[in-house]
Amino acid sequence: MSEPKPFAYESKVSSDDRGVFVPWLKDAHELEFAPGLAIKRIYYVANYGAGVIRGFHFHRKEWKVFIICCGAAKFVALDPQHPEDRHTFISSARKPNVVVVPPGYANGWVSLEPETILICGSSSSFEESLGDDERMDPYAFGDVWTVTGR
């Protein structure tokens, strides 16, 4: 069996005259990509301005699951031993992609809009995460944050 790689899937947005509803994890079956994975901790991170970089950080054991609930962000996940194994995802409140990062990948994000809020799910408690967390220079693998014109 090959090691899991980072991936994203689009979450359905339901909208009516009252507003929007976006299910993040509808049930445990959505976590079947990682047998035994349980979300132990949920938290949010907010960036005040566009262009703020959060990352890179790396976990050997911890899974992370992310979704943007306000604003927009570019996510980057890569294998520090093989940085060419790079995965880039865009998520926003308008098109909420759930981004899943398995252990062994350095990951981070840059806000593309002011007031961006990221909801995070983790397979580790806060205490477990402290011993498994390695911070890295956001430019250790070059400028992977800039949005390029097409």
Show the residue positions of the predicted features.
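Glycine-rich nucleotide phosphate-binding loop and flanking beta-alpha elements
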Residues: N107
